[in-house]
């Protein structure tokens, strides 16, 4: 199949009428959200923060320290991106700020550039390298600061209203009305206070208040009920409510009010909050005023009272006009503010303590607090995540993720249904499909393909203007936020349009004020630019998406991100046309930055001689540091080979161009992992049959042909990293050496003279990768060694083997060894003298137990691999590759897979590829079905094979059983599907344990593969054995095989010596339970009944804890635990 030449074929234009919007409205740069946000931080955010702290004065006011923020400098990074990854260090620049120290008494001015900390730099792929690992800062979606009105119905059925004034940081202010028509205010969720107290305390007179209100008569009731207050009384009352128990003063009240709402250090609406406040309350306060004004508070009260008269509207908190996105730049800015706050405190203290004459700016400024704040953010914030690098799509999606969790956001437990639900304002901004399954559903989303973030952090999406029923393709698309779009009638992107841009048909579906309705073409204001505008990048890769149920499309989107990069990537026969852009923006492929000629190509580098002037459009420095390239200059692109990704998959690039070839700017020069020809290629096109086969595809299981194993169709490379450090111990340094005690020469044959495995060696479980010995103390010595020493008086070498070995179930070839030592100037963790890293690569063929999936949420586990000759075969004798269960389609309602496999069959037969944009009804009714039938008919006509397509039984073919050669009873649906191998590989999951570690308290085996744990025999499994009456099996499971310490040692002893296994004792967890009950003060003990000699019975208490020796018995038998008698018994 691969030998055929596949041509790119567009939507079959001949068959379908010409009315369509060209779906190739180019997507924006898909990781622009990360880059532009970080650029904003460097150009504005950082300067803003530095300036807000300047000047810092000491408590006496004689010293002033000014930061000249706009002149800050960044020094060259210490290591390049590659070097930082190799050395496990951070790719960061040093920040220097010019400072000026002013002594007001003497008039001295000292100027100095001061180092204030390291700032991790974003790579051109939108990631950060922290301690050698690539990390991504996820965008957070939070409630926007501003004023929100909501209505509630109290228990008497009366409607009351409330207004919340939410700042970026500072105290909340909440106004509410009650059933007696009184207006109240709460400051920071404290006790209620009459609204007039606050207004009077602000210094407003009755006349000013009444003039500002539209319905002063409503407010009059509050004044009548409470009585008149003067400004002084109001301030006293305010102080009494906020600081109960302290003697109130007018001055105290004034200070309290000022610091709560009018001090820019304590209260900040932010640019966004001011914008939202002005917009909602129709104010015209300038953008620079970031604190509240008395006018804001009056206007807020006025709007609240107007709501009682049905003027104005209440807010929907889940509307995207009220939620904003905080990207890297802003999150980082908040963190820098935290660091600078700590720094300011330190500077003040130093100013007070030190002698003013000898002070210099450098001695005042300590970079530690700022460094710590930034480090903490990148290292341990919930929003700084280890990048998902399974494949290019996973990487791209991770950078476009929107999370409602994190600091200042929601928590999983508190988030209700409304927050998680799809909202009409998500259209074109947040994908309604791509979200995780499970507890995070709806809290973590993905940016839609065309969405972008505006200067205030609100999501915008583009629309084309429509005039009198005609779409204006000649005008640029207008980007609109959810607020702006609310009062417009907006049509979706898949409506039919004639060649002049006029909308066809009498009725058009539109969205208007959060409702979906229909209207005439003349009434439409805007139309979406593209049918895939509403979904995310991953979802837009699913062909025939419109025929899939949303739940399955969600699984399809999520599983494409888990596809493992294969050895021989192959792009899909049926794609959506967005694969190329997805691959390019993920940063996995190398893209030419200029026009030019290729002058040199090998496996590791490509050189291009520039033929034109490179525009400095972005002005953004790239990897190689050039901003502009002069004509005739050579640009070098490094091709990375077999690098390990964060998920242990293999990152490998291979050149696509030849020497002497002309390239244009933006052309793909080299493919990365999971790309072919510059297009995403996550899986393989394979021939599929939908039919049951001997029950091997029961419950979604998959039956595959041995061809997929033999021809390496689904073979992937995985690179594991093993690391060991030689530390300084109390008894001396650990050594990395070849001289390991009690290890034969055979085990050392692959090691070099240093004791490190050589590159290219094949290793299996238990093999030594790095030999290491640790000095051991007296107590570690077994008795026979003490004996030897007593006899010969010499010290046997006091070291024990502590080598790095290949863990259970792993094998592969050593591809790289890296050695880091203090002498070479490498930065090592404290206490380590040397670190050795070994990379082991393995080829994993597909096998039983691996998980496979299509793009439509059709996933399953491989249950059997059949020989090629036993697979069902087609009339021309070619066997199918995979057999899926037809019952997986009807109830799941993901019919897109059937369209895909049939169109794929036509493409396979014709030797062409199809690009089909989802939502294709704009090409006419039933257009998916028409193109599939048309192409199958064409395939039959071109090949002249009648069996390829039978119009009476469309899409089905007679198939023959490979074992008997007889035809199956009915024709079977055959096609070519694009199937992915997912990262859930059986090799990583299968696990067995004989003896291993035990939990300290309960003495039960640990759980999980990583801990070498056992299988949990839980409550329900115990019931099963009880039901069978298998008493001894059950007793054994609950004691000897689990947590009866003495019993398991004795049992092991007995098995080793072939004796009868003794009776089990008491489980440790029973003792723990007793102790816990005793600790609650309950006298609980174990009693046994003993029969006396005279036949009477006696109740005796048993002390389970008395057997101290049993508790000290080591978990594995050593020479000490074997008694003299038991050794004699052996003879």
Swiss-Prot record:
CDD domains the record matches: RNA_pol_B_RPB2 (cd00653)
Keywords: DNA-directed RNA polymerase, Nucleotidyltransferase, Transcription, Transferase
Lineage: superkingdom: Bacteria
Gene3D superfamilies reported for this sequence: 2.40.50.100, 2.40.50.150, 3.90.1100.10, DNA-directed RNA polymerase, beta subunit, external 1 domain (2.30.150.10), DNA-directed RNA polymerase, subunit 2, domain 6 (2.40.270.10), RNA polymerase alpha subunit dimerisation domain (3.90.1800.10), RNA polymerase Rpb2, domain 2 (3.90.1110.10)
Region (Disordered): 1108-1131
Regions of compositional bias (Basic and acidic residues) in chain numbering: 1122-1131
Name of this chain's protein: DNA-directed RNA polymerase subunit beta
Organism (species): Nostoc sp. (strain PCC 7120 / SAG 25.82 / UTEX 2576)
Gene that this polypeptide is encoded by: rpoB
């Amino acid at each position: 199949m691969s030998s055929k030449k596949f041509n790119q074929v567009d939507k079959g234009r001949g068959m379908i009428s010409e009315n369509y919007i060209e779906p190739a409205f180019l997507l924006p740069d898909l990781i622009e959200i990360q880059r532009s946000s970080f650029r904003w931080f460097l150009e504005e955010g950082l300067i803003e923060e530095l300036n807000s702290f300047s000047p810092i004065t000491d408590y006496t006011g004689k010293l002033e320290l000014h930061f000249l923020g706009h002149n800050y400098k960044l020094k060259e990074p210490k290591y390049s991106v590659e070097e930082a990854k190799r050395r496990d260090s951070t790719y960061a620049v040093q920040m220097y700020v010019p400072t000026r120290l002013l002594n007001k008494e003497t008039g001295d001015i000292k100027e100095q550039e001061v180092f204030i900390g390291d700032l991790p730099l974003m790579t051109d792929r939108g990631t950060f390298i922290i301690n050698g690992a690539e990390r991504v800062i996820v965008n957070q979606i939070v409630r926007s600061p501003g004023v929100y009105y909501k209505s509630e119905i109290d228990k008497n059925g009366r409607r009351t209203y409330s207004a919340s004034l939410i700042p970026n940081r500072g105290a909340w202010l909440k106004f509410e009305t009650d059933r007696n028509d009184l207006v109240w205010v709460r400051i920071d969720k404290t006790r209620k206070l009459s609204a007039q107290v606050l207004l009077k305390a602000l210094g407003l007179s009755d006349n000013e208040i009444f003039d500002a209100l539209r319905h002063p008569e409503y407010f009059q009731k509050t004044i009548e009920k409470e009585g008149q207050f003067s400004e002084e009384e109001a301030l006293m009352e305010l102080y009494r409510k906020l600081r109960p128990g302290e003697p109130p003063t007018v001055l105290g009240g004034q200070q309290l009010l000022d610091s709560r709402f009018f001090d820019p250090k304590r209260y900040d609406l932010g640019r966004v909050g001011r914008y939202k406040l002005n917009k909602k309350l129709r104010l015209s306060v300038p953008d620079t005023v970031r604190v509240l004004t008395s006018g804001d508070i009056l206007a807020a009260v006025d709007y609240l009272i107007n709501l009682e008269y049905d003027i104005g509207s209440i807010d929907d908190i889940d509307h995207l006009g009220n939620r904003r996105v905080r990207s890297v730049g802003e999150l980082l800015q908040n963190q820098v503010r935290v660091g600078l706050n700590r720094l300011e405190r330190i500077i003040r203290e130093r100013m007070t303590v030190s002698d003013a004459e000898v002070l210099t700016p450098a001695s005042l400024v300590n970079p530690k607090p700022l460094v710590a704040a930034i480090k903490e953010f990148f290292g341990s914030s919930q929003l700084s995540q280890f990048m998902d690098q399974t494949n290019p799509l996973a990487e791209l999606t991770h950078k476009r993720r929107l999370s409602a969790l994190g600091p200042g956001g929601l928590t999983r437990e508190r988030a209700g249904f409304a927050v998680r639900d799809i909202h009409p304002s998500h259209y074109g901004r947040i994908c309604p499909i791509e979200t995780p399954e499970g507890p995070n559903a709806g809290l973590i989303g993905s940016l839609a393909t065309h969405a972008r973030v505006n200067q205030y952090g609100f999501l915008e999406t583009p629309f084309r203007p429509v005039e009198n029923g005609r779409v204006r393709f000649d005008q640029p698309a207008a980007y609109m936020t959810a607020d702006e779009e609310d009062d417009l009638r907006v049509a979706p992107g898949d409506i039919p349009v004639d060649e002049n841009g006029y909308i066809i048909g009498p009725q058009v579906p539109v969205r208007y004020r959060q409702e979906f309705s229909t209207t005439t073409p003349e009434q439409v204001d805007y139309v979406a630019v593209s049918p895939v505008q509403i979904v995310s990048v991953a979802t837009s890769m699913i062909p025939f998406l419109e025929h899939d149920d949303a739940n399955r499309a969600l699984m399809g989107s999520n599983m494409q991100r888990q596809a493992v990069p294969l050895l021989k990537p192959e792009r899909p026969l049926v794609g959506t046309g967005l694969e190329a852009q997805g691959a390019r923006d993920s940063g996995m492929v190398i893209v030419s930055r200029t026009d030019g000629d290729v002058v040199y190509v090998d496996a590791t580098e490509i050189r291009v001689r520039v033929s034109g002037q490179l525009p400095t459009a972005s002005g953004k420095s790239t990897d190689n540091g050039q901003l502009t390239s002069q004509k005739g200059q050579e640009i070098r692109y490094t091709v990375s080979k077999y690098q390990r990704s964060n998920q242990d998959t293999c990152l490998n690039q291979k050149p696509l161009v030849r020497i002497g070839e002309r390239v244009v700017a933006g052309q793909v020069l080299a493919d990365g992992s999971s790309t072919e020809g510059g297009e995403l290629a996550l899986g393989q096109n394979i021939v599929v049959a939908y039919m049951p086969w001997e029950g091997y595809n029961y419950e979604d299981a998959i039956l595959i042909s041995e061809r997929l194993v033999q021809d390496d169709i689904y073979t992937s490379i995985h690179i594991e990293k093993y690391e060991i450090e030689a530390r300084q111990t109390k008894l001396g340094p650990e050594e990395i050496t070849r001289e390991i005690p009690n290890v034969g020469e055979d085990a050392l044959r692959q090691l070099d003279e240093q004791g490190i495995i050589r590159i290219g060696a094949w290793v299996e479980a238990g093999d030594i990768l790095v030999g290491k010995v640790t000095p051991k103390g007296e107590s570690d010595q077994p008795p026979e060694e003490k004996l030897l020493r007593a006899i010969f008086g010499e010290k046997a070498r006091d070291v024990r083997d502590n080598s790095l070995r290949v863990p259970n179930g792993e094998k592969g070839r050593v591809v790289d060894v890296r050695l880091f030592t203090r002498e070479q100037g490498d930065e090592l963790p404290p206490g380590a003298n040397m670190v050795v890293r070994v990379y082991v690569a393995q080829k994993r063929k597909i096998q039983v137990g691996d998980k496979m999936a299509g793009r439509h949420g059709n996933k399953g586990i491989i249950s059997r691999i059949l020989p090629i000759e036993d697979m069902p075969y087609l009339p021309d004798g070619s066997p199918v590759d995979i057999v899926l269960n037809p019952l997986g389609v009807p109830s799941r309602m993901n019919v897109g897979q059937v369209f895909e496999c049939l169109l794929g069959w036509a493409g396979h037969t014709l030797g062409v590829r199809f690009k089909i944009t989802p939502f294709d009804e704009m090409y006419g009714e039933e257009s998916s079905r028409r193109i599939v039938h048309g192409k199958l008919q064409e395939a039959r006509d071109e090949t002249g094979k009648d069996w390829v397509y039978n119009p009476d039984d469309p899409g089905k073919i007679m198939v023959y059983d490979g074992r008997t050669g007889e035809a199956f009873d009915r024709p079977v649906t055959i096609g070519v599907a694009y199937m992915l191998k997912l990262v859930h590989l059986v090799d990583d999951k299968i696990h067995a344990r004989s003896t291993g570690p035990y939990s300290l308290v309960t003495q039960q085996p640990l759980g999980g593969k990583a801990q070498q744990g056992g299988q949990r025999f839980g409550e329900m499994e115990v019931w099963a054995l009880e039901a069978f009456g298998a008493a001894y099996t059950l007793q054994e499971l609950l004691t000897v095989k689990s947590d009866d310490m003495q019993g398991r040692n004795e049992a092991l002893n007995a098995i080793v010596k072939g004796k009868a296994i003794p009776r089990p004792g008491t489980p440790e967890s029973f003792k723990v339970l007793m102790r816990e009950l005793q600790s609650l003060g309950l006298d609980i003990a174990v009693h046994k009944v003993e029969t006396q000699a005279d036949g009477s019975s006696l109740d005796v208490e048993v002390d389970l804890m008395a057997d101290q020796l049993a508790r000290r018995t080591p978990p594995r038998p050593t020479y000490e635990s074997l008694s003299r008698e038991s050794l004699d018994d052996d003879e």
